[in-house]
């Protein structure tokens, strides 16, 4: 290992990435083994921290400057991270980050285009460690989740409807009408 190389625990970095709906595959130029992820010096790690909008101090004890400009940060259309979510061969979502800031790393706002409907097999996520509020901005959305008795629940949300989901509740959103495209805004926090 080079003297300049910085190591961050792999599980810790994966947890940070999960708050951004990302995986190690979404980072370029990082090496890793079973337990560590290696960065080519502090500048490399700072660039990754800035890209994720997560304070450098979340990676290790240190200081980071605010990414706000006079108390605000603006994210422009098509300027943020975007990825496709494929579950078991089914194209479920296109995730697009809304504004992220290192001043509130536990907050993740996403715009999602829904691609699946009842024609594809149901694929719930495994739940996640954050609370979630979802608002339907376009279309009609079928939401499914696992209830308290491990029973599959479902409902339909129309444009303007919203839902709150506790941490670790497996859930999924699909288009309610086959062939129609829906859009949701998801706010994950805490």
Swiss-Prot record:
Its cofactor is Fe(2+). The lineage of its organism: Bacteria, Pseudomonadati, Pseudomonadota, Gammaproteobacteria, Pseudomonadales. Keywords: Antibiotic biosynthesis, Dioxygenase, DNA-binding, Iron, Metal-binding, NAD, Oxidoreductase. It comes from Pseudomonas syringae. GO terms for molecular function: dioxygenase activity; DNA binding; metal ion binding. This is (S)-2-hydroxypropylphosphonic acid epoxidase. Non-heme-dependent dioxygenase that catalyzes the oxidative epoxidation of (S)-2-hydroxypropylphosphonate into (1R,2S)-epoxypropylphosphonate, the final step in the biosynthesis of fosfomycin antibiotic. Fe cation binds at residues 128, 132, 171. It catalyses: (S)-2-hydroxypropylphosphonate + H2O2 = (1R,2S)-epoxypropylphosphonate + 2 H2O. Pathway: Antibiotic biosynthesis; fosfomycin biosynthesis. GO terms for biological process: antibiotic biosynthetic process.
């Amino acid at each position: 290992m080079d003297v300049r190389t910085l190591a961050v625990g792999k599980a810790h970095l994966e947890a940070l990435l999960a708050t951004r709906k990302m995986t190690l595959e979404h980072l370029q130029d990082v090496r890793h083994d079973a337990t560590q992820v290696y960065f080519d010096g502090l500048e490399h790690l700072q660039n990754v921290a800035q890209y994720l909008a997560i304070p450098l101090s979340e990676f290790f004890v240190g200081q980071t400057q605010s990414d706000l400009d006079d108390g605000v940060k603006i994210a422009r259309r098509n300027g943020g991270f975007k990825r496709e979510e494929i579950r078991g061969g089914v194209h479920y979502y296109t995730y697009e980050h809304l504004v992220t800031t290192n001043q509130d790393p536990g907050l993740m706002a996403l715009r999602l285009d829904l691609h699946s409907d009842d024609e594809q097999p149901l694929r719930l996520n495994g739940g996640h460690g954050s609370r979630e509020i979802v608002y339907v901005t376009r279309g009609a959305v079928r939401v499914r989740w696992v209830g308290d008795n491990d029973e599959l629940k479902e409902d339909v949300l129309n444009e303007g409807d919203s839902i709150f989901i506790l941490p670790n509740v497996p859930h999924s959103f699909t288009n309610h009408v086959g062939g129609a495209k829906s859009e949701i805004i998801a706010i994950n926090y805490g």
